[in-house]
Amino acid sequence: AEAAQLPSLLADAEYAVINSNYAINAGLNPVKDSLLIEGSASAYANILAVKEGTENTDAVKALKAALESQQVVDYINEKYDGSVVSVVTNPTDGYDASVNYDALNGTTISVAASPTPHAEILNVAKEVLAEQGIDLEVVEFSDYVQPNLVTENGEVDANYFQHTPYLDSFNEENGTHLVSVGAVHYEPFGIYGNGVTDLKDLAKGATIIIPADDSNETRALFLLQQEGLIKLPDDADAAKGVSTLDIVDDGGYN
């Protein structure tokens, strides 16, 4: 199923593997409501992405510095309480000494983003940039296609909504030329169920729905294998991707 639809489908499908971003939007608490929440998954950290060739512009570097500020890191860790986690290991004051901030004073940097948590996080970075006289315009999108297209065609300076495996897949399928300039946070996947509070009580024959896009389908299947619910081939490679067709033992689940 489409990743954004998973929370609404949960009532009919018994169980679902849901990204914490969508769980939060649906009123679920990933830490309290999930049967299991994924551990640190650095390969799936959400990134700031730009069009290739703009990585070293002052605007992009200033934006990256703001997102790596202590102010933003503290906001993420306090606001989301483990359901969204900062991956910035050395927070700064939000200032990049290599940037000509005088030249950026009075300018606007535009970023395409998902509403939650990306736009919320960017609004904190907006405060950091404002201290240097820079305005940050956050353009919200509810889908996972338009943010990359408007970044590719130059309508916005950057986007913040996806992880690297999704970006790589999107570039390959659409001929776009987008690159990551840094990881900001990750959103752990969780396994959710109706009326079940312990993973060991997950019933045989139950239906488990997972995201349909290639990168997140792979991620969900490896999580299910990690918990012993399914078995993938011994040579299964997350970097190359897997699908439900690759499952060698479904554990009695659908």
What residue spans do the PLM features occupy?
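Ligand-binding "clamshell"
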Residues: 25-37, 169-181, 196
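Short helix-initiation/N-cap motifs at beta->coil->alpha
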Residues: 1-6, 138-149, 236-254
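Beta->alpha turn/N-cap motifs
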Residues: 2, 11-14, 18-24, 115-116, ...
